[in-house]
Amino acid sequence: SIADPDCRRKVTEKLNTERLFFSNRDFIGSFIYEKRLNLVFRYYHENLLSLLGGVYLVEFADCKRAALGLIAACAECGAGADMGVLLLNDRNINITREGEVQFNYFLDFSQWQPGIEEQRYYQEVAQKVFGILELNYKGKYETPDSYPGEIGRF
């Protein structure tokens, strides 16, 4: 829930004019209660990628599928660049046993920076994608430059 009046106003404006999250199948709606704006999303059990990625993504092909899934999830979430950066927090990215990527929406609006350039958002998405792709190589090689060809190209 968002208590800060300025932040609440800006998010409400985005909901109404930019249709923030409306293309997101997980977005249920929003409401105001006791001067707080509440955004309601479908909840997924927390299977954090940061904790379970190495367990569920055993082969490079699994990592590649999950990386593409993260790109698709970012494209489909309807968040835009400034909210999208908030979604990329490790607490929000889940991985299923099948390698599907899902978001939880624990958005920390104290970290929200309206007007973030899309380029920065794309760079952060790319960093997360590379983090998924390198799951099976990190720790086995001294530097990313020494990764084998299949990941080295990325």
Regions found by a protein language model. Name each.
Residues 2-66:
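Conserved structural core of kinase catalytic domains
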Residues 2-5, 44-46, 73, 98, ...:
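Generic structural motif
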Residues 19, 78, 133-136:
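Conserved NTP-handling cores and scaffolds of large molecular machines
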Residues 38, 43, 66, 76, ...:
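Broad hydrophobic/π-residue packing in well-ordered secondary structure
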Residues 67-71:
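Residue(s) on the long, well-ordered alpha-helices that form the structural core
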Residues 72-84:
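Protein kinase catalytic-loop region centered on the HRD/HxD motif
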Residues 83-85, 90-154:
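C-lobe/activation-segment region of protein kinase-like
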